[in-house]
């Protein structure tokens, strides 16, 4: 009976000592958090291992993350993974679709995104671009003659149109002189002519008798305007003037219309401010609807694919510029010892318990061996 009690005692003591020793060793990894002094003498094993080596641990964790966890190869492989790309494209399409189907006005959306004075800035920018383009166009074309400035096809169209222009001018002139207004104007011209000639009017009156001069002149004017020869004459005059115009410089337009007036007239016709205002008052859905399918089926997948490809090709440079090791080191260095202890224990809690139990098991086995040795020695 005493023998079995001795074996039980040695086994129990061995288990207790083994378990407690391992438990104490685990605790000494973290405790105490600060060095303990007796006078000027620092108690050995204080502070605990992890508090004492926290800075070194932070450095090593940073290196481990960069060299073994977040490696360029690993991230690059993930970025080029087909399933990952499909998932990211789908997510991007969903998010983009939420934006482009929004019924709020474009102006309201921009204000939500803190884009201020967009209407004023857009108007000024567009007007500036238009002005610069017009001025550049005029600067270039002012160095040309009209023959150089206009395409050959335009010259042909103008030349072919001259007979029709002549017919149009003569037709309108005929209509005018056939009207009462035209007759009155012709009468005034005749009166002014004879008024400057004095007695010539009396001499003409003797020949014409009671018939007024305008009644005799009007039919002749109309007859003259309707003759083919008159049309041919006017056509030849217009053709000669066109040939003269071809050799003249475009810059001569400035003598009639200043460059600034041309620019101002075009800007007034375009109505940039009104156009921009109408555009911003449209809903995002109205603006994007014509191109929604293109955005969803082509633009979004294309942008995501190219972005991932660029990221995979430049991942090493990106990681270097991020300085991940320094970030991890700085974050770990800011952890309190208590937080660091909780972090490690939350990960290794079960394993550390098993180490304690293993110590108790080994201690118990040693106790059994001691009991057996005592038994044989007796």
UniProtKB/Swiss-Prot annotation:
Annotated membrane topology: Multi-pass membrane protein
Main location: membrane
Alphabetical UniProt keywords: Cell membrane, Membrane, Transmembrane, Transmembrane helix
Descriptive protein name: UPF0754 membrane protein BCAH187_A1042
Record-annotated membrane-spanning stretches: 1-21, 357-377
Keyword DNA damage: no
UniProt-annotated location(s): Cell membrane
Superkingdom of this protein's organism: Bacteria
Organism listed in the record: Bacillus cereus (strain AH187)
Transmembrane is among the record's keywords: yes
Family to which the UniProt record says this protein belongs: Belongs to the UPF0754 family.
One GO CC annotation: plasma membrane
């Amino acid at each position: 009976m005493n023998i079995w009690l001795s074996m039980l005692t040695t086994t129990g003591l061995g288990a207790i000592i083994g378990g407690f020793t391992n438990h104490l060793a685990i605790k000494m990894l973290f405790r105490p958090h600060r060095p303990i002094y007796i006078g000027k003498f620092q108690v050995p094993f204080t502070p605990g291992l992890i508090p004492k080596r926290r800075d070194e641990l932070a450095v090593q964790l940073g290196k481990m993350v960069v060299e073994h966890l977040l490696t360029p190869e690993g991230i690059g492989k993930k970025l080029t993974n087909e399933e990952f790309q499909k998932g990211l494209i789908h997510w991007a399409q969903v998010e983009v679709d939420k934006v482009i189907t929004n019924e709020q006005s474009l102006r309201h959306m921009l204000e939500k995104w803190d884009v201020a004075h967009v209407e004023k800035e857009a108007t000024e920018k567009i007007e500036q671009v238009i002005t610069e383009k017009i001025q550049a166009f005029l600067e270039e074309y002012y160095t040309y003659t009209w023959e150089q400035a206009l395409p050959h096809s335009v010259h042909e169209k103008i030349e072919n149109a001259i007979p029709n222009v002549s017919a149009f001018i003569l037709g309108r002139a005929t209509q005018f002189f056939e009207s009462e207004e035209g007759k009155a104007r012709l009468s005034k011209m005749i009166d002014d002519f004879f008024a400057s000639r004095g007695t010539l009017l009396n001499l003409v009156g003797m020949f014409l008798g009671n018939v007024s001069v305008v009644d005799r002149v009007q039919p002749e004017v109309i007859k003259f305007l309707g003759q083919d020869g008159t049309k041919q004459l006017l056509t030849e005059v217009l053709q000669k003037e066109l040939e003269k115009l071809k050799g003249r410089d475009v810059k001569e337009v400035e003598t009639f219309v200043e460059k600034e007036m041309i620019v101002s007239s075009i800007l007034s016709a375009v109505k940039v401010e009104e156009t921009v205002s109408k555009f911003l008052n449209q809903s995002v859905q109205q603006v994007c609807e014509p191109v929604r399918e293109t955005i969803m089926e082509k633009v979004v997948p294309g942008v995501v694919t190219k972005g991932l490809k660029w990221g995979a090709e430049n991942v090493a440079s990106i990681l270097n510029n991020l300085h991940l090791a320094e970030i991890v080191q700085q974050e770990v260095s800011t952890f309190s010892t208590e937080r660091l202890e909780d972090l490690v224990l939350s990960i290794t809690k079960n394993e550390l318990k098993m180490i304690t139990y293993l110590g108790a098991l080994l201690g118990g086995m040693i106790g059994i061996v001691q009991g057996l040795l005592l038994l044989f020695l007796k």
